[in-house]
Swiss-Prot record:
Record note on domains: The C-terminal domain binds 2 Fe-S clusters but is otherwise mostly in an intrinsically disordered conformation.
Region (Disordered): 30-115
BP terms from Gene Ontology: iron-sulfur cluster assembly
One Pfam family per UniProt: CIAPIN1
Protein name: Anamorsin homolog 1
Organism: Trypanosoma cruzi (strain CL Brener)
Length: 115
């Protein structure tokens, strides 16, 4: 049985990799991030509002009309109470801490002594 040994890697024969050769033309195209069409997931207009919602709210307040807050949609995936790691992208509770959805909106405090 003859065994031939071949080196899998040698520092002497290592060639520098041309980083530009790794990218394709499709990779080089700069892609712009897209913004959502509406801001119905927020209760108020953003500080730097660009969609026109801030102007609409100011106009309605000047006319003496009540600014109607959009209804927060109920989550459809059923994972809203578990936390951001389990929530869908359109969850109205995104960014909020996990909660107990069986408590009817009441906060449970643990007031027992540790001693």
């Amino acid at each position: 049985m003859s065994s031939t040994t071949t080196q899998a890697f040698s520092l002497k024969t290592r060639q520098a990799v041309d980083e530009d050769a790794l990218l394709t033309e499709e990779d080089r195209v700069v892609k712009e991030a897209t913004k959502g069409e509406d801001c119905t997931t927020r209760r108020r207009a953003c500080k730097n509002c660009t969609c026109g919602r801030a102007e609409l709210e100011r106009k309605m307040l000047a006319e003496g009309k009540k600014v109607e807050m959009p209804q927060m949609p109920a989550g459809g995936c059923g994972n809203c109470a578990k936390g951001d790691a389990f929530r869908c992208a359109t969850c109205p509770f995104l960014g909020q801490p996990a909660f107990d959805n069986t408590s009817d909106g009441k906060v449970k405090l643990n007031l027992t002594d540790d001693i």
